[in-house]
């Protein structure tokens, strides 16, 4: 009996040992949880086909509007946020004319200088060559005349001496071009004295519109005449300052029925003015206030590239837009944050746009004109960050195609930084599984995503490229894929 017990025990031990050799004693790996089974689409990146080089992304203004108290315009936390988190690489400012009786100004250089120097210090901290650009809304009042015209090509336009202000339009006195150039040069020097080389200068903001705030108006012929006289005087002292313009509406400079009769057409017709304008700049409004948004932008940007920036060999910038609510999708007639993402895409993809500059970066309340309230951010900020933070100056857009019409894709290679960036927008109502293919792509990308919920340019996970790999892109989201380290 004892022998039988021993034999049975030995048999049980052998069975147990056999089970262990099959792996029962080895740690069991965590189960691989794949993305849900979703309809699959392909995105193809062709790095051999190259388009525009990126100059940057940014906004206008200080931590609050210029008419706010000086103490609210700069603080260290805000400066840190916009440089190291949002990732602006362009900052736009107004050159204010002197105040006169009945026409006070929101700011002067004494009020602006601490903001300029604060941003420069923050940019230097991160080895960022922040591009400072400035726009004139109105020349000094004593340099202006009255004017009257109905559109840019109005041959019956008149201008003459009269009672004028910095507000409510008027035009530059053509006998004061030298004085205007001298005034502009003195303002460029203010930046230089503060340790900043001004990167770009616009001679006039939205030159078609008579506004109750600072404004000045030009016909196409007057603008060319002014630029051809003033720019050489500026360049004689500051040859590296880039002149951008005309800062008119993309609706006017890009629509089928408009592009041939407005300012960029006038610039193109003049060999001299073409040489004097370094960068073609438009604003993303239909009338100076309402945002130009939606599918029509693709045609406007396509026209602008085909008619102007490509044949003239000029960079294209979008230097002001707003009018988007912070809701994720369109509210009434106001576009939302997801619309903003698609509109940035339109400029990059269809217009070969090199720069995108929002209107007011921050103010005391978050509204359709601002991205932030101090350091408090919303969906427009997060959507902007998907582009600003990861597509850095010097990045070159390369060819990208999608097999799904609901997916909008732009891709960028930054050789100097060794980074690859792909921005994907799923505008549709269905989640999809995405495969990224192309020659010589990084194996792994970090994925950042913004949606209508709690994701705000949030790191999701690492994903792999290649046709055998895929990752989920939920409906109505924007994703940025980044490889090669931190772009900042």
Model regions and ranges:
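Sec-dependent bacterial lipoprotein signal peptides
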Residues: 1-18
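Bacterial Sec-dependent N-terminal signal peptides
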Residues: 16-40
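N-terminal catalytic cores of secreted or lumenal carbohydrate-active enzymes
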Residues: 40-199, 203, 211, 218-224, ...
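Structural recognition of the beta-strand scaffold that forms the well-ordered cores
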Residues: 53-61, 87-95, 131-136, 199-203, ...
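Noncatalytic carbohydrate-binding groove/subsite architecture in carbohydrate-active enzymes
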Residues: 177, 214-343
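Aromatic/acidic polysaccharide-binding cleft in carbohydrate-active enzymes
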Residues: 315-389, 398-402
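Carbohydrate-binding surface patches
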Residues: 403-443, 476
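C-terminal beta-strand-rich structural cap/linker in extracellular carbohydrate-active enzymes
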Residues: 461-488
């Amino acid at each position: 009996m004892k022998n039988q017990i021993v034999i049975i025990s030995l048999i049980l031990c052998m069975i147990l040992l056999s089970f262990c050799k099959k792996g029962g004693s080895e740690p069991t790996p965590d189960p691989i949880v794949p993305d849900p089974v979703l309809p699959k689409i392909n995105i193809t990146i062709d790095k051999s086909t190259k388009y525009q080089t990126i100059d940057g992304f940014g906004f206008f203004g200080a931590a609050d509007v210029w008419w706010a108290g000086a103490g609210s315009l700069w603080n260290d936390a805000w400066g840190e946020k916009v440089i190291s988190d949002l990732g602006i690489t362009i900052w736009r400012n107004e050159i204010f004319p002197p105040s006169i009786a009945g026409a006070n100004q929101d700011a002067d250089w004494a009020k602006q200088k601490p903001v300029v120097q604060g941003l420069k210090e923050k940019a230097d901290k991160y080895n960022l060559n922040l591009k400072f650009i400035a726009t004139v809304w109105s020349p000094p009042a004593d340099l202006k005349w009255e004017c009257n015209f109905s559109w840019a090509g109005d041959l019956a336009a008149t201008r003459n001496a009269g009672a004028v202000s910095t507000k409510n339009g008027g035009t530059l006195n053509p006998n004061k071009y030298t004085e205007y150039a001298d005034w502009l040069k003195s303002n460029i020097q203010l930046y230089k004295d503060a340790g900043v080389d001004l990167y770009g200068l616009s001679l006039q903001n939205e030159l078609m519109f008579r506004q109750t705030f600072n404004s000045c108006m030009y016909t196409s012929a007057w603008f060319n005449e002014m630029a051809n006289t003033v720019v050489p005087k500026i360049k004689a002292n500051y040859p590296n300052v880039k002149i951008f313009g005309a800062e008119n509406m993309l609706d006017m400079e890009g629509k089928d029925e408009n592009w041939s009769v407005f300012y960029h057409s006038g610039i193109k017709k003049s060999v001299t003015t073409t040489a004097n304008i370094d960068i073609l700049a438009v604003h993303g409004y239909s009338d100076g206030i309402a945002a130009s948004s939606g599918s029509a932008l693709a045609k406007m940007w396509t026209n602008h590239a085909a008619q102007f920036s490509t044949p003239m060999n000029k960079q294209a910038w979008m230097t002001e837009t707003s009018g988007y609510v912070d809701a994720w999708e369109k509210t009434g007639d106001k576009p939302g944050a997801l619309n903003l993402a698609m509109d940035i895409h339109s400029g990059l993809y269809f217009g070969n746009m090199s720069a995108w500059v929002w209107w007011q970066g921050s103010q005391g309340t978050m509204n359709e004109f601002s991205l932030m309230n101090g350091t408090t951010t919303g969906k427009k900020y997060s959507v902007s960050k998907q582009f600003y933070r990861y597509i850095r100056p010097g990045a070159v857009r390369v060819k990208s195609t999608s097999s799904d019409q609901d997916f909008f894709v732009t891709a960028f290679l930054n050789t100097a930084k060794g980074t690859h960036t792909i921005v994907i927008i799923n505008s549709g109502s269905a989640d999809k599984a995405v495969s990224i293919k192309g020659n010589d792509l990084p194996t792994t990308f970090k994925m950042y995503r913004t949606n209508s919920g709690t994701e705000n340019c949030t790191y999701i996970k690492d994903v792999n490229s290649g046709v055998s790999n895929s990752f989920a892109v939920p409906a109505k989201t924007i994703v940025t894929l980044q490889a090669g380290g931190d772009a900042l």
